[in-house]
């Protein structure tokens, strides 16, 4: 087992990474609080019943899917916590993917004005991205994660054994976020991914441990430098401005998050290439790597139809869009002065990279 530490001004917490570490670490943390509650999906509870020897009265279930990141679910779970006498010294254990983690973190941040929570991500996407850094949130019709808080967990427990039960589609979705780290700040890591596609797809344990740790080191560096996303942390949203728009346009049902981000990264890179920020090789290598991992690279939506969502992006201010565009593999730039009409014109021309 390896351990990293997120070290912030007002909070420090550990990230545990290993194989088959779940049972021991849950037992270690569960009794630290006045009462503990597991927030999870019914199917995960069933699969991990032996590892999670937790009484049913301490389990609260969440439906599968992005639709669960809603005010309705927040109220429902908060009422359950109140009925079960959760107090300010209680803790929530988020056992699931990004939906469970984002929802649980948000509830923990507002229930009784803040209680503790532990992240136990079970998808590759949540293990390398959403469980780290303290972002919580729920969706509304107008966009993804538009309601949320910055609220850090007490600990993050990453047991890569949980990836064994993921569907191939869910697993691949997480790989998009892994590729993102190579694109934004680690050229050597990007080359590693190019050379190890087959072993990563086959879930080779040693390769996976390396991929997850390297991804987390990238995110740790950025979060510690810019906790509240005032500047540097925005680079973690490479591909997400377009990706979130694609998710929202599809009603959060047609695309998984990573699938939408994969298309979003390619759209952003195509835009960067056409505007002279990066060369054609950057675009081609990203496209090739995404295709090797089995991602679709075309958006089914017209860029004009996505602009409604893009303009609500959380990085935007004063009506101005902020986009993260690549300079080269391993380096991106926050760009603020691109006109909406230019984005539409360029991406409409990109037959191979979006519609």
Curated annotation (Swiss-Prot):
Q: Which residues form a coiled coil?
A: none
Major subcellular location class: cytoplasm
Q: Which HAMAP family does the record cross-reference, listed alphabetically?
A: DHQ_synthase (MF_00110)
Q: Where does Zn(2+) bind?
A: 177, 240, 257
Name by which UniProt lists this protein:
3-dehydroquinate synthase
What family does the entry list? Belongs to the sugar phosphate cyclases superfamily. Dehydroquinate synthase family.
Family annotation (Pfam families): DHQ_synthase, DHQS_C
Q: Which reaction does it catalyse?
A: 7-phospho-2-dehydro-3-deoxy-D-arabino-heptonate = 3-dehydroquinate + phosphate
Write out the pathway annotation from the protein's UniProt entry: Metabolic intermediate biosynthesis; chorismate biosynthesis; chorismate from D-erythrose 4-phosphate and phosphoenolpyruvate: step 2/7
Q: Which PANTHER family match?
A: 3-DEHYDROQUINATE SYNTHASE (PTHR43622), 3-DEHYDROQUINATE SYNTHASE, CHLOROPLASTIC (PTHR43622:SF7)
Q: Name one GO molecular function term.
A: nucleotide binding
Its source organism is Dictyoglomus turgidum (strain DSM 6724 / Z-1310)
């Amino acid at each position: 087992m390896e351990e990293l530490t997120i070290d912030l001004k007002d909070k420090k917490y550990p990230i545990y990474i290993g194989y088959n570490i779940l049972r021991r670490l849950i037992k270690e943390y569960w009794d630290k609080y006045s009462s503990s509650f597991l927030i999870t999906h019914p199917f995960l509870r069933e699969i991990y019943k032996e590892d999670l020897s937790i009484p049913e009265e301490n389990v609260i279930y969440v439906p599968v899917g992005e639709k669960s990141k809603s005010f309705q679910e927040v109220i429902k779970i908060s009422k359950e916590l109140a009925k079960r006498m959760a107090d300010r010294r209680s803790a929530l254990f988020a056992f699931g993917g990004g939906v469970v983690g984002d929802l649980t973190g948000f509830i923990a941040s507002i229930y009784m004005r803040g209680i503790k929570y532990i992240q136990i991500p079970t998808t590759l996407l949540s293990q390398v991205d959403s469980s780290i850094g303290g972002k919580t949130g729920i969706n509304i019709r107008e966009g993804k994660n538009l309601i949320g808080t910055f609220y850090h967990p007490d600990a993050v427990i990453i047991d890569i054994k949980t990836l064994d039960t993921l569907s191939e589609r869910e697993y691949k979705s997480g790989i998009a976020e892994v590729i993102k780290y190579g694109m934004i700040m680690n050229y050597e890591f990007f080359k590693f991914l190019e050379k190890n596609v087959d072993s990563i797809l086959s879930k080779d344990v040693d390769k996976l441990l390396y991929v997850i740790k390297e991804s987390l080191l990238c995110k740790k560096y950025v979060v510690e430098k810019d906790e509240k996303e005032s500047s540097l942390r925005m680079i973690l949203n490479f591909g997400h401005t377009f990706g979130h728009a694609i998710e929202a346009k599809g009603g959060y049902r047609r695309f998984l998050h990573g699938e939408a981000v994969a298309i979003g990264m390619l759209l952003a890179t195509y835009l960067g290439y056409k505007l002279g920020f990066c060369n054609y090789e950057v675009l081609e290598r990203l496209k090739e790597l995404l295709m090797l991992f089995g991602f679709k690279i075309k958006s089914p939506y017209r860029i004009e139809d996505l602009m409604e969502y893009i303009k609500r992006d959380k990085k935007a201010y004063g009506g101005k869009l902020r986009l993260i565009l690549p300079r080269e593999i391993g380096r991106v730039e926050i760009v603020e002065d691109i006109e909406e009409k230019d984005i539409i014109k360029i991406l409409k021309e990109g037959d191979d990279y979006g519609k």
